[in-house]
Amino acid sequence: MSFERDLLRRMFDAAINAAQPAHCLPPHLPAPPRGRLVVIGAGKASAAMARAVEDHWQGALSGIVVTRYGYGVPCERIEIVEAAHPVPDAAGLAAAKRIRDVVSGLSAEDTVLCLISGGGSSLLALPLDGITLEDKQ
């Protein structure tokens, strides 16, 4: 491999590594709340971001994120739901309703950490009244 090609490869690898949620998310976590920390989110990287939060958050937390089928990662305190992307499906609709229900029950002392990445719009398909999931598909 040429010097230039090797340099470009190392730069590319460094950029990919720097963008990994486990590296870039922890410094930006919020201060511990007086109430609960509830994590919600959607997108192809949301499960990896949720895992990074779990790995670096010392206090209690809970939540739910929705990611693309096959993109889930093991989490203990944050539920990971998989749904269709780019065409929304019933799993994404159900996850969006559950996220809405979770945040509806929060108090002023609770903190919501919302993890959004690419694909979130199809993974959180909760149409307004009069619009069906089939319309969104």
Language model regions located:
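Non-transmembrane, aqueous-exposed alpha-helical and coiled segments at domain scale
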Residues: M1-S117, S121-Q137
